[in-house]
Each structure stands twice: as structure tokens, then as C-alpha cells.
């Protein structure tokens, strides 16, 4: 514990304060306030964090001793005040609980009831956050035997007041000779850590990690020390060095990592004004500034700070794995004779774990640094790597240099890993965890721990990349065929599966450099393929996949797939069926690996539609594009066949169709045309809007719920409709707006429910939606376009300036308005309100929500049903949209663009 520090607590001054005041509470509160202010100022000035948290514990010791002395405990009383838990270690953060054990010799507490109650009341009154228990030595033993948490807490204890002999007796009766022997304790703690990690999704890379409990957090270091304490009686990192479980460099790294996390935790408590161990978005930017990080042209300060955080916890996880593996080998010796199985002259299995046959294996044959992972892929029965071999891997990483990277033995081994029938993802993760992957591929090393500060990318770039490869592997499993039927079928027939894994490894490799990461990554991928002696065609395919890995997703979500020109342009880009197959599978894996919430039935159906329409175009030949007139004729003929079979008069149908333009038949299937036509012809002419709802199979690919609205056109139709859908908690994915020559509108919306699924066949929900929409369209003044709802906490921290781009599609005679803005409740309704103010008509819309941002595309015309041709009008429209979408944003707006 620290030496006496009068600036923090002056006992003489405190006694004088007590003497001057009628109540002791004010003096105690003043002393607490004083040491808190001094310690916070010292933290802000960069003082050593270990000293700060030890000083805080010392200050609380002084307060507790002064409080304890105010009560009559009797002469030679067998009662002691004992610090336990983190406070017992002598470590205390600004708002951490002060965990206390009032320890008695016997279970008879009655004689001490009055002073105990008075003491605890005083602590409450002076504002100390105390967690307390009152137990006898025997009660401690009974509760510790039954509860892992209790025994763990009692292992870390020190006496604050009273005889230390009570604590010594308590430690004796709760020692490993009486309960929780080291083997049992180790197994329980290992299981506890596994459960805790599962709570945080078994990743160090959560967007808002818990610095204490997440994988790689402070608790992982404490778990190691608790295990060591139970086995060896030692409770510090240097003791692990003496016992041979750590080397000095690892001990130093763990100590510095612990101190970094202590600084983060101290800052969190200080900023939050309470006990807060979650590194929430609310605090990440502030802590980044506090730690001296600044934005630059390539990365935000918060991204650089979080990369430091993720690299620290990754290193802690690596050493936690190493030490626990080592503990397992020592604490859980195999009761059976050791089983040795040679693999080759360099490696063998010892009881199922791979190890080197000699300590100099990596030094003598550096290629073994890669070979070990290939062997584990070839032998999936291998349980893992022995602790000594993990340490040798770590210590031999320096052998990987440029000469190593260009050695054909090493390049061949690395490619062989990608050709393995199983274990690719698992062993790439091991390579990353042991620091081999980033050393072998320096470009991969740059993205380790790199977070993109948004809600769309929920993993660091390296974790996302390895997750993508994991998803590619999952597509090979038979059980995945139901969820990913097309991708599972395609991946089985890829001529060289290793190429898609290489493309996956490199698709985001250039993130964080500035510039177009797809272009830069394609260059890196080409260089990798060349240095690994891949054939020219393979090299070009991998590079092309990296360069275009976003194109299929962007096309599917932002363009009108009913437009034959869109399909033709995309088919020209891919060129052949092989490129299409590889790109489709890569896109499916990329979306799933970016954020699990992104993959829904709608996105799946859009990609499937784009794939199949492109496949048809390629089979037909790029020199034979789809003829629009022929497509319209085919749709009408098929629809008419259905209608006639249903008893609808052909003349009535054709009369209705004559009022519709070509776009209607290009943008709807024959089945939908027949469905709409029959319902319209049977709908009473009483002015009530017609609202139809069904599960959609648009072009046999889309999956969602289709809402079809037929009603007399009105000025505010789109604005009112989207506002009503917002209030009904519907997420609009697509909108197709058709206005007939008789001034009726035929609008089709593809929607998902709030949970991301289609509405389904729930009669009550369908009735609610139908009635809500009819009411809104009959009473439009009751539906304001500004939806007032609370903005979710996480969205508040990702505000950015809305961007509005307007261009002209001369072929379709519409203006294309693209909006990129922070997601907010009622955003689409706000946009609809602006369109209403400017007397604009929406012909089509593509809606995409990506994490905290929306990327929506609207095809609009003016009051004369023409594209927007007036630059001044466009500027005013942009300004109005930016102003409306910037509300509650808190950021300056960025310039927008007009491209005619």
C-alpha cells in the first residue's frame, strides 16, 4: 500500500475538522470529496494509474478506520473489518464498490449489533458505495464451500481494523486443503470464464465492450491470478514468471495491458459519474480525446483509440489462452499413460495436442511456422496446441521476413491451407491469435483491431474478414442449404474453391488507408496471387472479385431490377457465369459477416433475383438484350390467361390496361398484374381506397409482404402513405408508383415488419394495416409527416451530415435523388413531406438501412411529370432535405452534389 500522503488525507487535519463540527458526516464527506478531486486531477495530468487506484484504496482505508474508531467494539473484541474482492487487492476505481467483510469469531452477532448498524449507517450517510457482509469464520467456510464467487472473493482480503488473526483463521479454514482443491477450482473458474465470454458473444470485438468482463478484459487477467493463487499461493504476475508460466516479456506485456485497461476504466467512471465498465459510444470519443488521439485524414481519433483497445484485449486473450492451457497441463495431468503420436520429424501429438518434437524446430526449419496450421487442418481431431509450442510460435514470429514470405515452401504451404477440405477458418483464426497471420501478411497486420466507428460494421476489419471465411465454410454444410439454398448449391460447383477464400481474405484488406479500398485491395490481391505462383486466370479472378465485391450488393439494393438495362449492365460487368457464381457467393458471405441483422428475406431475394436475371442474360448472350416490347407482351398474355380462367372479361381487363403505361408491366409479374386487375375491376366505385396485402413472390424471387394500393391520386399520396406505414411499424424496402391516365394511382410497397420478417398470414395484423392505410388515405390531414419518436441511444452517437445527390436518367425521363442520412424514426415520412412541399411525384424508390445510416434512392418527377430541369429548384430541394434530415443531428452539413 502507498505511503502516507497528506494531500490525499491528513489525519491531523481531519481530526481537527471533526472537533469543529457538531456532526461527523460533513467532515467525512469533505475528506472524500477532497481525495477524489486530487486523484482525478492526478489522472488528468498523466500520473501512474497503478499508483492512483492503490492511493484511492488507501484513502478509503483511512476513512473506514476513522469511522470504525467512532464505535465501541469492546476491549480485545473478536471482530475485524476486512477488505475483500478488488478492494481487498488494494485496487479501487472512482466508483467501484467498497467490498467489506465484518468478520466475527463466533456466530453470536447480537453483542455487536448496535455498533455494526451504526457503522454501516455512517458509511451510507457519508456516501460510500459499500457492499458488505457480516459473517463468522465458520459461516465464511460454509458459504465459501458452496459458492465459487464467495471463495474467490475471500482469497483476496486484508484487514483494515481489528485483529488480523481472524482473517488468518478464515484463510486457513477456506484453504485448498479443506475445500476447492486447485483442480476443482481450476475447472470451475475455466467454466465460469467460458460462460462469461459466451455472454459477450465470445469476441473481444464488441462495438461497446465491457472493459472488465468482455473477452480480453480485466477479469481475464484476474482469472489467471485466481487460478495461480489456488495452485501456488501466489497472487501476482511476477509469481507466474517464477513458476515458469510466463516469461518476463509476457509479464511486462500483461502488466502494461492491465494498466491501459485500468486507465480506460478510471476514465469511464470519471466521465459517467458512476460505476460504468461498458465502453459505450457515449464515452468512446471523449476517452479518445482524453488519451490524446486526434482525427486525421485517414482515421477518426475514436477509431485509432478503439484499435489500440482491441489490440490490447486481443493480446490479453492470447496470453490468457496460453496460461490456461499451461495450467491445464499442470493441474489436470492425464491419469492414463501419455499417448505420443508422431506426425512427422517436426511435430507430434501428445494426448491429442500438437507440439514440436524439439525446441529448435522453428529456428532450424522456419517453414514449420506455417506447416503446423496445415497439419491441424489435415487432422481435425487435433484438440489444440500445447502451451510450450504456442510460446515457441510467439517467440519465433521474427523469423517471418521478406525472404520467408517469398520462399516457395512457405507460399505453397499457405495456399495448401486454403485448399484444405476443412479447418480453414479455425486455423486462420489460430494464425491470427498467435500473431503469425499478420506477420506473414503485413497488409493484414495493419487491419488487426481496426474498427469502423458505425453500427453497420459491428466487427473489426480482421474479425469481419475471418467471419466471412467462416460463412463461406458454413455454406458447404448440408444444414445450411435451407437458409442459403442458392449459395450452398453454387459453392459446391466452384471450380477452385480456394480462390474465393483468398478473395475473402483480401476483400477489405485496404480498409483504413484512405482512398477506394476495393481498388487498393485489388492491387494487393494481385500481388499476393503472383507471389504465390497462382496462374494468370486465377490471379485476375481474385483481383476482380476484390475490386467488385460491393457491386452486386449495391446493384441489388439500390437499382431497379425490373429494368432490363440494369440487368444488361450488370451482366456486362461480370461477363460470364463463373464470375457471377464467385461474386454471388462472396456477396452472400460478406453481408452475413458484416452484421447478422443485415441478412433478411428481402436482401436474400434481391440478390437471388439479380443472380438469376443475370444468368438468363448471359445464357441469352450479351449481344441479344431483352426487348422491352416483347417483355410487356409476355406479361400481358400470361396475366390475361389467368384472368379469363377466373371469369374476368378480356375487354374489361384491356380497357383498364390501356390507362397504364409500359412501366407498370415491366415492373410487375404476370401474377401480380392479374391479381391487381381482378381486384380493381371488382372494387366498388365509392371512393374507398383499395388496399391488398399478400406475401410477395415478385419475379419469383422477392420475399417480403406486398401492399398494393389503388386509389384516386392526390397531391399528398406518397407522404401520407409512408407516414401511415411508419406509424404501423412497417419498414419499407421498395416502392413502385404508377399513375394511370384516369388519375388513379397504383402503388406497390414491399414491406417488412419491425422484426425484419414479412407480415406473414396473421389476419389481425393484416386487418390492422389495411384499416390503418385506408383511414390515413381518407383522412390525410390526420397524418403529419414529422413522426415524433425517441431516437435510440446508439443512433445519437453516429450523427453525420446528410448527403443529397440529384441526377437525371434521360432514358426513363426521371430524376434520380439519392439520400444518405443518419437513420431516424419517421425519416421516410419526413422525406415524403418535403416532396409534397415541392409538388414532386415519386415514381419508384429503393430503401436501404445500413446500421445507423440510410441510403435511399427515389425516382421523381415534377408537377408536369418531367425530370427536374431547374438547377435552382434542385438546390432548394437539396437544402430543404438537408435541413429536415439534420434535425437532432448536431453536426455541420456537408456539401451536396447535382449531376445532370
Curated annotation (Swiss-Prot):
EC numbers for this chain: 2.7.7.59, 3.1.4.-
Classification via Gene3D superfamilies: Beta Polymerase, domain 2, cca-adding enzyme, domain 2, Nucleotidyltransferases domain 2
Pfam families to which the protein is assigned, alphabetical: ACT, GlnD_UR_UTase, HD, NTP_transf_2
Domain HD: 461-583
Coiled-coil regions listed in the entry: none
Needed cofactors: Mg(2+)
InterPro entries linked to this entry: ACT-like_dom_sf, ACT_dom, HD/PDEase_dom, HD_domain, NT_sf, PII_UdlTrfase/GS_AdlTrfase, Polymerase_NTP_transf_dom, UTase/UR
Chain positions covered by the region annotation Uridylyltransferase: 1-342
UniProt keyword list: Hydrolase, Magnesium, Multifunctional enzyme, Nucleotidyltransferase, Repeat, Transferase
One MF term in the entry's GO annotations: phosphoric diester hydrolase activity
Single biological process term from Gene Ontology: regulation of nitrogen utilization
Keyword Repeat listed: yes
Known catalytic reactions: [protein-PII]-L-tyrosine + UTP = [protein-PII]-uridylyl-L-tyrosine + diphosphate; [protein-PII]-uridylyl-L-tyrosine + H2O = [protein-PII]-L-tyrosine + UMP + H(+)
SUPFAM superfamilies for this protein: ACT-like, HD-domain/PDEase-like, Nucleotidyltransferase, Nucleotidyltransferase substrate binding subunit/domain
Activity modulation notes: Uridylyltransferase (UTase) activity is inhibited by glutamine, while glutamine activates uridylyl-removing (UR) activity.
Region (Uridylyl-removing): 343-705
Residue ranges of every copy of the ACT domain listed in the record: 706-789, 816-891
Database matches in SMART domains: HDc (SM00471)
Function statement: Modifies, by uridylylation and deuridylylation, the PII regulatory proteins (GlnB and homologs), in response to the nitrogen status of the cell that GlnD senses through the glutamine level. Under low glutamine levels, catalyzes the conversion of the PII proteins and UTP to PII-UMP and PPi, while under higher glutamine levels, GlnD hydrolyzes PII-UMP to PII and UMP (deuridylylation). Thus, controls uridylylation state and activity of the PII proteins, and plays an important role in the regulation of nitrogen assimilation and metabolism.
Family, as annotated: Belongs to the GlnD family.
Notes on the domains: Has four distinct domains: an N-terminal nucleotidyltransferase (NT) domain responsible for UTase activity, a central HD domain that encodes UR activity, and two C-terminal ACT domains that seem to have a role in glutamine sensing.
Name this protein carries in UniProt: Bifunctional uridylyltransferase/uridylyl-removing enzyme
Organism per entry: Pseudomonas aeruginosa (strain ATCC 15692 / DSM 22644 / CIP 104116 / JCM 14847 / LMG 12228 / 1C / PRS 101 / PAO1)
Source species taxonomy: Bacteria, Pseudomonadati, Pseudomonadota, Gammaproteobacteria, Pseudomonadales
